[in-house]
UniProtKB/Swiss-Prot annotation:
Its EC number is 5.4.99.25. Keywords: Isomerase, RNA-binding, tRNA processing. It catalyses: uridine(54) in tRNA = pseudouridine(54) in tRNA; uridine(55) in tRNA = pseudouridine(55) in tRNA. It comes from Ignisphaera aggregans (strain DSM 17230 / JCM 13409 / AQ1.S1). This is tRNA pseudouridine synthase Pus10.
Length: 430
């Protein structure tokens, strides 16, 4: 059966707009929109019936008159030109109720306005809803055993996407879009999910009693006056995005400063309001909030980079500076013995007593590569400690009542405590 015969049978029963008719034959022909395809099929059908009428088939004219309300003006105008008066009342499309063009135009404009406002450079489109339209077109496809039709959602995605690209500088990108746009036609809603902006950088803690995360007591009061997370979340108030998350290479205690090379981290801005932001604007904003924290932002990264940063902290080495106090005088021989003993030494640590309430009691093995020491006073000395990531340095010094072995205390046969601790270098494997 020819396309014209199939279209004839369909239009005898259903009024269809050009787009919805063309969509039933969407896989036939190249370079045509469904609107053009449907109009061409209607014209071809009208021409064929007119030809048959001119060839003497009087039933063809009757057939054309019967079809005209479902075909539309193309058929009606021909019938009138043949001198036949007919009453014509436009009918609505059985599938889309004559709404599909309005849907395409309206949502294209709304989304284009959003894209221009947010400076989005690439997007991918999805459609929800239109279930009643889908049900109707599926019933026609099944009734007439159509093989070349396409779903209305597919046409809406394609046509709205094309118009958006014409109205903006944004392009469709299926692999790495800056925005995922979902149109819920039944609810008349547009949802825009922008993939997070991920920015790699480093931070420095120039003071003590600064936590990485906001730490609240049971009463909801901040336990520490300042946190890195708190500073980062200022970006939400400034309108950079809906939320901010920090992915940090390891952590240090609140009373430990981070100096030297700083600590690597990735700043994640969720659902960013704009994509083409200047990293230095964010860096300047972060650095303007507290003189006790310094940030340096270097580059945009992908999600895989975040994993490498977090994984690298477990395999990298770190250098700390500790000020240590002992309960007896420490001489030059003690210092030499300490340095020699902790050269490439494996340390066994059970979870420190001070964190047992929130961490599982497990045995960890970490390596101390070397230490360098300098006597400050008879019972106070400075130690530079190069060690594997994940080592509890305070417990390396104190021994934690035998939970860390060996320790400074066990080697020196003295009670030693860490007075202050600074992280000087965090090596990266990324």
């Amino acid at each position: 059966m020819s396309i014209i015969d199939i279209a004839n049978n369909i239009l005898r029963k259903y009024c269809l707009c050009d787009r919805c008719l063309g969509r039933l034959f969407a896989s036939l022909g190249r370079g045509l929109s469904n609107d053009e395809r449907g109009k061409a099929i209607k014209i071809a059908l009208v021409l064929e019936l007119h030809k048959r009428y001119l060839d003497g088939d009087k039933d063809s004219l009757k057939q054309l008159v019967e079809l005209s309300p479902n075909i539309g003006p193309i058929a009606v105008n021909l019938i009138k030109n043949l001198g036949i008066e007919i009453e014509y009342t436009p009918r609505t499309c059985f599938i889309c109720d004559n709404k599909i063009n309005d849907i395409i135009d309206t949502y294209s404009q709304r989304i284009a306005d959003i894209i221009n406002e947010r400076h989005i450079n690439s997007f991918v489109l999805g459609i929800r809803g239109v279930t009643s339209y889908i049900r109707k077109e599926e019933s026609i496809a099944n009734e007439f055993k159509l093989l070349y039709w396409e779903n209305i959602k597919r046409e809406l995605k394609r046509e709205i996407g094309k118009k958006i690209q014409m109205m903006t500088n944004a392009k469709v990108d299926f692999l790495n879009p800056e925005a995922m746009i979902i149109i819920d036609i039944d609810r008349d809603r547009i949802y825009i999910e922008s993939p997070s902006l991920l920015i790699y950088g480093r931070y420095w803690k120039l003071g003590r009693m600064i936590s990485q995360n906001i730490w609240l007591t049971k009463n909801g009061v901040k336990k520490y006056p300042l946190s890195i997370e708190e500073i980062a979340k200022m970006l939400v108030k400034d309108g950079f995005g809906d939320d901010v998350v920090l992915h940090i290479a390891g952590r240090e205690d609140v009373d430990v400063r981070t100096l030297g090379s700083g600590r690597p981290f990735v700043l994640e801005i969720k659902r960013p309001r704009k994509r083409n932001i200047d990293i230095k604007d964010i860096e300047n904003r972060l650095n303007s909030i507290s003189r006790w924290l310094k940030f340096e932002l270097n580059m945009f990264v992908d999600r895989d980079f975040v994993s490498r940063v977090k994984k690298g902290c477990r395999t990298s080495y770190k250098i700390y500076r500790a000020i240590v106090v002992a309960d007896r005088d420490i001489g030059i021989e003690d210092i030499k013995r300490l340095e020699e003993f902790f050269r490439d030494r494996i340390i066994e640590q059970r979870t420190p007593t001070r964190v047992l309430r929130r961490k599982k009691d497990v045995l960890r093995r970490r390596k101390v590569f070397e230490i360098k020491t300098r006597v400050i006073s008879p019972r106070v000395f400075e130690a530079l400690i190069k060690c594997e990531g994940g080592l509890y340095v305070k417990e390396l010094i104190s021994g934690d009542n035998g939970r860390t072995v060996p320790s400074f205390s066990s080697v020196l046969n003295a009670n030693t405590l860490c007075l202050t601790l600074d992280a000087l270098y965090v090596h990266e494997y990324i």
